[in-house]
A protein has these predicted regions:
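N-terminal Rossmann-like NAD(P) cofactor-binding module of classical short-chain dehydrogenase/reductase
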Residues: 69, 73-76, 107
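Short, Lys/Arg-enriched N-terminal segments with co-localized hydrophobic residues
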Residues: 1-5
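A hydrophobic C-terminal alpha-helical subdomain
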Residues: 232-262
């Protein structure tokens, strides 16, 4: 039984989440059970040196994906760092290739409440699409519905602290259970390591408003960053003024305080 088991494949090992998940996986599995894929050849080298099978993959282009995924039983698909039709297409390419390569299960990093279609955020639509598509092609799945990474919000907090300005956005008094990216990575690695058929909600312990988050930041750092609520449109204008592109296809400023799109 054991010998017929295929390998475990992790995509996106050159990204923040993927790198953390790769490190956990290496403590759980022998290297000969693993395949690591990434966009950036340089970042794959250290794993190849350890004896892990590695492949350079670009999900925007389906060429070569089936070959890269061959021999894997389970594949962890970390969602792409862009939004909209481009991301949906990239995810579709990866899922199609997994199916064609004989992969049995996809473990996909989705978003908390992805199945709640009453909240049609731009970010969420891609996750709804990908979850549905994985089911449609008939692959077994685990969905890791991750909450907002705490680290991203800490970066956001310091952006405003450095500008000596209030943290301004349209979150209002919305509640969020922030969670460390490290915990999400650990959950992903274990989901790949142990077979389940499940939708996981990967949440922080405590729901809090952004005001509470800022207050915790103030106590921890000695800064003073109050929260100011604005409309979505006003929020876009603030980011525009900082030179932040509105979409992930926009031009990112080098060394920007805000390395993301609005």
């Amino acid at each position: 039984e054991e010998e017929s088991m295929g390998k475990l494949l992790l995509t996106g090992v050159d990204g923040n989440l993927g790198q953390l998940a790769a490190d956990v996986l290496l403590t759980l599995e022998p290297v000969e059970n693993l395949i690591f894929c990434g966009y950036n050849e340089e970042s794959l080298k250290k794993y190849a040196e350890k004896g892990v099978e590695t492949h350079v993959t670009n999900f925007n282009n389906p060429d070569g994906l089936v070959e890269a995924f061959k021999g894997a039983d389970a594949l962890a698909l970390i969602s792409m760092p862009f939004v909209g039709a481009k991301r949906q297409n990239a995810h579709k390419n990866a899922v199609d290739a997994a199916k064609a390569a004989g992969v049995k299960q996809i473990i996909y990093t989705s978003l908390v409440n992805a199945d709640d279609e009453t909240n049609p955020s731009v970010e969420k639509k891609d996750h709804i699409y990908t979850e549905k598509y994985i089911k449609e092609v008939g692959l077994d799945y685990q969905f890791m519905r991750n909450s907002q990474y705490a680290e991203a919000m800490v970066t956001n907090y310091f952006t405003y602290a450095h500008m000596n300005a209030p943290l301004t956005n349209s979150q209002g008094d919305g509640l969020m259970a922030y969670i460390s990216r490290k915990d999400c990575a650990k959950a992903l690695a274990y989901a790949l390591h142990e077979f389940h058929h499940k939708v996981w909600n990967i949440n922080g312990l405590e729901l809090m408003t952004i005001s509470t988050f800022c207050a915790i930041g103030d106590v921890s750092t000695g800064n003073h960053v109050p929260f100011v609520n604005v409309t979505d449109e006003e929020n876009y204008q603030i980011w525009d003024a900082m030179g932040v592109p509105r979409t992930t296809d926009g031009v990112f400023l080098k060394d920007s305080e805000a390395p993301f799109s609005s």
